[in-house]
């Protein structure tokens, strides 16, 4: 019997490690190629983030991403709840200035996953109260990928947030091969490393590096 609601979402989110966020502006081979390679490497969660294409183009691309992820990875859409609904994605990731979590939940239903970007402990605690399923905490380090992200908060803040909530914590912002272990050591359940992966000619290799690092560091 297929699980529904909270128990199903919780079990899915417990399985994530490396979290792919797409970026067509940085990608060397294109969004679909990046998703395909990351999923084949073992990535179990993908967020489709696209700021420059029309809604029609996004729906078409999101439909293909859903097909690639089907049965292998959680598929979320960044911000665009209309696109997520159109392709029946597994959920959305929204920011502090986007649609409120409560409104998104009414539109998507209880079975869908909603992630919320947070910058500190207070925002994370509120996210949990509002019904988010996980938080994206950052920027952990200074990053050029998201120009309005602000200064890095540092990996020690991960533990502070992790100790305050029961939700999975996904670390994002300026994460690369040199600093990624500190992110997991400080309690992050998953991490995003956009430029370190999609700027590569071998996305599969780079995604696998982070997957292996996360699993190895968890066991240490």
From Swiss-Prot:
Residues engaged in binding 2-[(2R,5Z)-2-carboxy-4-methylthiazol-5(2H)-ylidene]ethyl phosphate: 143-145, 174, 194-195
Q: In which pathway does it act?
A: Cofactor biosynthesis; thiamine diphosphate biosynthesis; thiamine phosphate from 4-amino-2-methyl-5-diphosphomethylpyrimidine and 4-methyl-5-(2-phosphoethyl)-thiazole: step 1/1
Binding residues annotated for Mg(2+), in chain numbering: 79, 98
What's any GO biological process attached to this entry? thiamine diphosphate biosynthetic process
Q: How does the cofactor bind to this protein, according to its record? A: Binds 1 Mg(2+) ion per subunit.
* Binding residues annotated for 4-amino-2-methyl-5-(diphosphooxymethyl)pyrimidine, in chain numbering: 47-51, 78, 117, 146
The organism's superkingdom is given as Archaea
Which of the seven top EC classes does this enzyme belong to? transferase
**Catalysed reaction equations from the record:** 2-[(2R,5Z)-2-carboxy-4-methylthiazol-5(2H)-ylidene]ethyl phosphate + 4-amino-2-methyl-5-(diphosphooxymethyl)pyrimidine + 2 H(+) = thiamine phosphate + CO2 + diphosphate; 2-(2-carboxy-4-methylthiazol-5-yl)ethyl phosphate + 4-amino-2-methyl-5-(diphosphooxymethyl)pyrimidine + 2 H(+) = thiamine phosphate + CO2 + diphosphate; 4-methyl-5-(2-phosphooxyethyl)-thiazole + 4-amino-2-methyl-5-(diphosphooxymethyl)pyrimidine + H(+) = thiamine phosphate + diphosphate
**What's the EC number here?**
2.5.1.3
Which is an annotated GO molecular function term of this record?
magnesium ion binding
Keywords of the record, alphabetical order, are:
Magnesium, Metal-binding, Thiamine biosynthesis, Transferase
Say what the protein does: Condenses 4-methyl-5-(beta-hydroxyethyl)thiazole monophosphate (THZ-P) and 2-methyl-4-amino-5-hydroxymethyl pyrimidine pyrophosphate (HMP-PP) to form thiamine monophosphate (TMP).
What is the name listed in the Swiss-Prot or TrEMBL entry for this protein? Answer: Thiamine-phosphate synthase
- Organism, scientific name: Methanosarcina barkeri (strain Fusaro / DSM 804)
Gene responsible for this protein: thiE
């Amino acid at each position: 019997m297929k699980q529904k609601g909270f128990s199903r979402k919780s079990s899915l989110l417990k399985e994530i490690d490396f979290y792919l966020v797409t970026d067509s502006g940085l990608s060397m081979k294109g969004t679909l190629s990046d998703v395909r390679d990351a999923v084949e490497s073992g990535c179990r969660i993908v967020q489709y983030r696209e700021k420059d294409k029309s809604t029609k183009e996004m729906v078409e691309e999101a439909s293909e991403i859903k097909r690639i992820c089907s049965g292998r990875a959680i598929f979320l859409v960044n911000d665009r709840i209309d696109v997520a609904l159109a392709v029946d994605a597994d959920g959305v990731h929204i920011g502090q200035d986007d649609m409120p979590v409560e409104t998104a939940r009414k539109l998507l239903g209880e079975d869908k996953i909603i992630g919320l970007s947070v910058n500190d402990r207070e925002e994370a605690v509120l996210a949990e109260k509002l019904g988010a399923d996980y938080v994206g905490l950052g920027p952990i380090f200074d990053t050029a990928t998201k120009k309005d992200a602000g200064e890095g908060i540092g990996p020690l803040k991960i533990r502070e947030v992790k100790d305050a909530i029961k939700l999975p914590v996904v670390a994002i912002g300026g994460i690369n091969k040199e600093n990624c272990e500190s992110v997991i050591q400080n309690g992050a359940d998953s991490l995003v490393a956009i430029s370190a992966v999609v700027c590569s000619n071998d996305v599969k290799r780079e995604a696998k590096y982070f997957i292996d690092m996360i699993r190895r560091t968890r066991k240490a």
